[in-house]
Every structure is written in C-alpha cells, then in structure tokens.
Amino acid sequence: MRDNTIGSLIWLRLIRFTNQSNQMSNEFLKRFDLTTAQFDVLLQIRTYQPLTQMELAEKVTVTQGGISRMLTRLEKEGYIVRKQDWKTKTISLTEQGEAALERALPEQLAFQSSFFDDVLNEEEQKMLYELMTKVHKHSEKKELPQE
C-alpha cells in the first residue's frame, strides 16, 4: 500500500463504499420488490418524464443493454409505459409505478441518508457534497492519457 497516492486511496474507498452501499440498498429494497438500479430508473423517469431511452441511459448507472432489459421488465410489471410519438418512443411512469416509487422513496432516502447522518454533521456533509461535486465535474471533462 506504500505506493498508493492519497488520490488512489480515496478512489479505492469510494469504490468500496459504493459497492457496499449498493449491496445494502439492494437488500433493503427487496421489501419493495425493487433493485437499486430499478429504483434509480423509476426515480429518473418520474423526474424527467416523458423521456427517451437514450435520455434515460445518460442519467442512470445501467448500460444501454441493461436499460433495455430493465425497461421490458418494468413494463411487464406495469410500472412504466412506452409510447411511440411519431419517430420517438418515450417512457413514462404508470399509476402503479408512481405508487411503487412513493412506497419506497421515503424509506430508501432515509436509509441512504443514514450512511452520512450517522457519522457526519451537517457542515461535514455539505463539504463532502461540494468536494464530490467538484471531482465529478472534473471527471466529466477528463480525457484518457495517451498510450
């Protein structure tokens, strides 16, 4: 571990936290018959509906192929509807999808917030948010190094 820079240690910590948090969220969301990815997709659809599959894929952490399969499943379960508007197919929540999200949302947000609320005060949380936002914005512009 001596060769690691503080930046690489932060990156490893973020990866481990993300994996652990996703595993725990998946377990938590089982009580609502949802996965973390499905919850995220439903929340993004509700926030931006109607939207195309391509627009949705840009907003979530699921691959294009994974989005396709997930949308098919969510449509079969009655949570979403896909409508063809001339050349564009848009996605919206159904009443059933809205109800599922409303049941899960408050509890999932409280669960996720507890990761931070339990150990960081409000000022520390704001600082962490600002730092992560700064790193995220930089990462969106970052290019791969030349070979």
From Swiss-Prot:
Keywords: DNA-binding, Transcription, Transcription regulation. Disulfide bonds: none annotated. InterPro entries: ArsR-like_HTH, HTH_MarR-typ, WH-like_DNA-bd_sf, WH_DNA-bd_sf. Residues 53-76 bind DNA. One of its GO terms (molecular function) is DNA binding. Signal peptide: none annotated. The keyword DNA-binding applies. The keyword Kinase does not apply. Residues 1-137 form the HTH marR-type domain. PANTHER family: TRANSCRIPTIONAL REGULATOR, MARR (PTHR42756), TRANSCRIPTIONAL REPRESSOR OF EMRAB OPERON (PTHR42756:SF1). This is Uncharacterized HTH-type transcriptional regulator BCE_2019.
